[in-house]
């Protein structure tokens, strides 16, 4: 079953900021994972995140493109079968995870 896909506004901007080849790579990866975005321990493609340094990313999953260094962090809204993209970017110095933590804090406080 294909899950619906939702981007928070900042994640749309992240996607737009990538060059064309990076955008194609991450879009293909997202579409693949979207077929079954559950965590790998539930038979899906998602790689669970826990705590990265002092950043609580529990409940989030990642898509990792090793060759290009791109990462996408998403969370599942199971009641709506929605895959919500939180951040897309380069892994450089864990920056993508720091950004995800900040955005999740904002989402959770709304």
Language-model features, listed with the residues they occupy:
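Enriched for short, Lys/Arg-rich terminal
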Residues: 13, 64-110
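A general secondary-structure junction signal
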Residues: 5, 47-49, 67, 89
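A short, surface-exposed loop/turn module that caps and links secondary-structure elements
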Residues: 35-64
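A broad, low-specificity signal marking well-ordered, structured residues that form hydrophobic/aromatic
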Residues: 5, 61, 83
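Short, conserved clusters of charged catalytic residues that mark active-site
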Residues: 10, 55-58, 69
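A structure-centric signal for secondary-structure junctions around beta-strands
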Residues: 2, 27, 57, 80-82
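Residue-level marker for the onset of beta-strands and adjacent loop->beta junctions
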Residues: 1, 59-61, 70
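Arg/Lys-rich, positively charged N-terminal/basic patches that mediate binding to nucleic acids
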Residues: 1-32
């Amino acid at each position: 079953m294909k899950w619906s896909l939702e981007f928070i506004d900042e994640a749309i901007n992240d996607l737009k900021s990538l060059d064309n080849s990076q955008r194609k790579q991450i879009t293909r990866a997202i579409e693949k994972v979207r077929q079954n975005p559950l965590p790998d321990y539930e038979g899906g493609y998602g790689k669970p995140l826990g705590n990265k340094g002092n950043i609580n990313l529990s409940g989030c999953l990642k898509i990792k493109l090793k060759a290009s260094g791109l990462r996408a962090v998403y969370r599942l809204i199971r009641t709506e079968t929605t895959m919500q993209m939180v951040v897309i970017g380069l892994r450089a110095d864990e920056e993508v995870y720091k950004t995800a933590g900040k955005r999740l804090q904002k989402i959770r406080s709304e």
